[in-house]
């Protein structure tokens, strides 16, 4: 397998480490670096934990590049049993066949059999998936007993160092969460609705950052940005602004509105935030028309990111009216046939299912029909087309409702922050 120079460099930098983190920007080929490191470590038994949508991609990668390695899909109970049996019978014996078991984050904590295994290599693809140390997946993974660890991520914490602790723990940095937070994060006490809680200082969120990065490198972390390795094409962001609807204004004022026969009740911060976003999406006929106009203006491939199923339905109807071939990636379907074969295809991608991992560089035009509220998903969505092999300027069309919550969401995402309930409540106070 032929590696790029930056991939060889990453492996060379971690030559003496058995626990490593490859924080390589999207498109720099973390898959190849991670799999090659796994082979170099030479464990008989290996486990890869990834997103559900990436299982088949990982299986294909090993079959294509490492045909002698035996691959198991651990989402299948029989294959899981065979994988465990093979480890019990052969691991550690000379001549044992190298095995790789692949499973997704949402299922791994339900496979208690994996806690029996020892002396294996554990690889986490998109290791930022374990940034919440109270989540079931994270607790389970931290209980596993690997000898070797490989972490792969393009945006390990979306620029938020407070969420790094669980990953550093896996790399062998024995620092308590409390001490980590004291040394590297600036927390401030705030009172809200009579309750005291701590938030990160907006002006100066972190401290001792140089020391933190040095400690991370000391524990096998490698950081690489795309611009350090390749000259990629320019990225151009084009806002497409449409007016708010009267229903949006009514809902923002009263917290209640009926639209298209559906009553939207904002009786909590969560529902207010959710419905405010929806009213800027498929409920906004001006935005749907603007999307139709945009799609009509080009016969090039379009990649369209959306949030909700109702948005998918509306976008599919428009694509069908325009007689455009449709591909889609969401929690139920991953069909890229039209994208692969039709130059005028429209590919509809739900953020949660497709913002990470997909290579969509045949296209150079991306439409954000609505915005995600997660910084990491926004950054990774942009990288689906802006990656190694892309030789065209990348255009990103940001469809925005003027003077709405969407403008605040975009401002927040551009600061590499999530748009949280707390920020929405602040937006509500500022809007009064």
Segments from the language model and where they lie:
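Conserved helix-turn-beta segment of the N-terminal RecA-like "Helicase ATP-binding" lobe
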Residues: 54-78, 171-175, 323
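Walker A/P-loop
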Residues: 17-37
């Amino acid at each position: 397998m032929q590696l790029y120079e930056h991939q060889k460099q990453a492996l060379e930098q971690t030559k003496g480490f058995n626990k490593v983190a490859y924080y390589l920007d999207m498109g720099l080929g973390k898959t190849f670096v991670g799999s090659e490191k796994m082979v170099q470590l030479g464990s008989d038994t290996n486990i890869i934990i990834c997103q559900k949508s990436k299982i088949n991609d990982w299986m294909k990668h090993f079959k294509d590049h490492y045909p002698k390695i035996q691959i198991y899909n651990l989402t299948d109970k029989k294959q899981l049993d065979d994988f465990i049996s093979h480890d019990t019978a052969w691991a550690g014996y000379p001549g044992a066949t190298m095995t790789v078991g692949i499973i997704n984050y949402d299922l791994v904590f339900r496979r208690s059999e994996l806690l029996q295994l020892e002396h294996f290599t554990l690889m986490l693809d998109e290791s930022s998936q374990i940034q919440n140390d109270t989540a079931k997946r994270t607790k389970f993974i931290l209980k596993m007993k690997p000898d070797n660890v490989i972490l792969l991520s393009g945006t390990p914490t979306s620029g938020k160092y407070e969420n790094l602790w669980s990953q550093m723990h896996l790399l062998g940095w024995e620092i308590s969460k409390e001490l980590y937070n004291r040394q590297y994060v600036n927390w401030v006490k705030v009172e809200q609705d009579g309750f005291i809680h701590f938030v990160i200082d907006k002006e100066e969120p972190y401290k001792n950052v140089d020391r933190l990065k040095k400690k991370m490198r000391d524990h096998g972390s490698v950081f690489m940005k795309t611009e350090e390795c390749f000259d990629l094409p320019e990225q151009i962001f084009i806002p497409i602004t449409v007016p708010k609807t009267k229903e949006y204004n009514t809902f923002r004022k009263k917290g209640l509105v009926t639209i298209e026969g559906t009553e939207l009740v904002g009786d909590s911060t969560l529902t207010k935030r959710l419905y405010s976003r929806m009213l800027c999406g498929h409920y906004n006929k001006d935005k749907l028309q603007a999307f139709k106009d945009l799609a009509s203006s080009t016969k090039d491939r379009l990649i369209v990111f959306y949030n909700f199923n109702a948005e998918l339905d509306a976008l599919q109807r428009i694509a069908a009216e325009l007689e455009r071939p449709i591909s889609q990636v969401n929690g139920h379907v991953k069909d890229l046939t039209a994208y692969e074969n039709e130059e005028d295809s429209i590919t509809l991608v739900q953020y949660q299912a497709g913002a990470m991992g997909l290579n969509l560089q045949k296209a150079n035009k991306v439409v954000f029909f609505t915005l995600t509220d997660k910084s990491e998903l926004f950054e990774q969505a942009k990288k689906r087309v802006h990656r190694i092999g892309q030789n065209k300027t990348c255009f990103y069309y940001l469809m925005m409702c003027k003077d709405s919550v969407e403008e605040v969401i975009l401002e927040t995402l551009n600061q590499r922050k999530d748009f949280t309930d707390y920020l929405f409540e602040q937006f509500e106070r500022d809007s009064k």
